[in-house]
Amino acid sequence: MKALVKAKREEGIWMQHDVPVPEVGVHDVMIRVTKSAICGTDVHIYNWDEWSQKTVPVPMVVGHEYVGRVERVGAEVEAFRPGERVSGEGHVTCGFCRNCRAGRRHLCRHTVGVGVNRPGSFAEYVVIPADNVYRIPDDIPDDIAAIFDPFGNATHTALSFDLVGEDVLVTGAGPIGVMAAAIARHVGARHVVVTDVNDYRLDLARRMGASRAVNVAREDLRAVMSELGMREGFDVGLEMSGNGRAFRQLLEVMNHGGRIALLGIMPGPEPIDWSQVVFKGLQLKGVYGREMYETWYKMVAMLQSGLDLSAVVTHRFSIDDFQQGFDVMRSGRSGKVVLDWGVAR
């Protein structure tokens, strides 16, 4: 089959046409991929940075954001049938550790990542356990279904705390950050402010419903808060940037008793003024992946109740033009990039 493969221990990803079709175990589902999306993780793997070198075995079929149709099911699978439109949870868990048995599969200490530690979805076919397959309702477009993985990250992070009537600061205007901003507005936050230094992505944040999108390289965040009539600090912080300076500013403008969910990963140790956390009584929560499968349920429910994410998909290419897609993603001047496998729905 045709697939995008991390075939060499160097920068780049390569199209190969002779990749073996993955085998289907008795509890597995084979999905024929119709559309894929490029994730920031895929860019890290493309760049072959320090994290990728330590994490990804080579060769590896990459990719974990997709939508497709069930092609084949294992002998013990009864919940799905060929032809159904589906996506899939990209974290394969053990099912036996304490967290898995308690229904907290997103905290499994033995998680294996699709497209990172096992063959992924930048391929004509991907095989995952049936437990990881999620059926897509007919009223959700393919382009949106293809980005359920990062949409799930945004949902898990944004819905970590009650947002109704709250003032929310999102640090980082990447695709996940702007989707989190849209979610916050959808569920009833009062002011949703997004910060970044990338004007392209700040404009995208405005289109996604942010009250204000602030370039902190040249704008005063506290002045913006004053203009919005905020007399105290932010009630909820969503840290999406993985930038130490952004996180420190977030701590400075949080209200006492504020709550912070952290999804962004800082590249190394960062000096933090912990007195901001202690004396303000802040709550910090690390977020990884999606809650299985409550996050997925809420994603569908929000889309069906009017959440509009269409603006976040900014570029579309044929899979044969994947290099253009990666170039756009690496430029920083894009939202989500979707690759079409040319398969009829």
From Swiss-Prot:
Active site: residue positions: 41 (charge relay system), 44 (charge relay system)
GO cellular component: cytoplasm
GO molecular function annotations of the record: L-threonine 3-dehydrogenase activity; zinc ion binding
Binding site for Zn(2+) 2: 94, 97, 100, 108
Pathway in which the depicted protein is active: Amino-acid degradation; L-threonine degradation via oxydo-reductase pathway; glycine from L-threonine: step 1/2
Site location (Important for catalytic activity for the proton relay mechanism but does not participate directly in the coordination of zinc atom): 149
Binding site for NAD(+): 176, 196, 201, 263-265, 287-288
HAMAP family, A to Z: Thr_dehydrog
KW Metal-binding (keyword) present: yes
Catalytic activity entry: L-threonine + NAD(+) = (2S)-2-amino-3-oxobutanoate + NADH + H(+)
Record organism: Anaeromyxobacter dehalogenans (strain 2CP-C)
InterPro entries per UniProt: ADH-like_C (IPR013149), ADH-like_N (IPR013154), ADH_Zn_CS (IPR002328), GroES-like_sf (IPR011032), L-Threonine_3-DHase (IPR004627), NAD(P)-bd_dom_sf (IPR036291), PKS_ER (IPR020843), Zn_alcohol_dh (IPR050129)
GN (gene name): tdh
Compartments in which it is found: Cytoplasm
Keyword NAD applies: yes
Protein family (similarity comment): Belongs to the zinc-containing alcohol dehydrogenase family.
Cofactor annotation comment: Binds 2 Zn(2+) ions per subunit.
UniProt-recorded name of the protein: L-threonine 3-dehydrogenase
Oligomeric form and interacting partners: Homotetramer.
SUPFAM superfamilies the UniProt entry points to: GroES-like (SSF50129), NAD(P)-binding Rossmann-fold domains (SSF51735)
Any one GO biological process: L-threonine catabolic process to glycine
Ranges in coiled-coil conformation: none
Record-listed E.C. numbers: 1.1.1.103
Residues holding Zn(2+) 1: 39, 64-65
Cofactor(s) named in the record: Zn(2+)
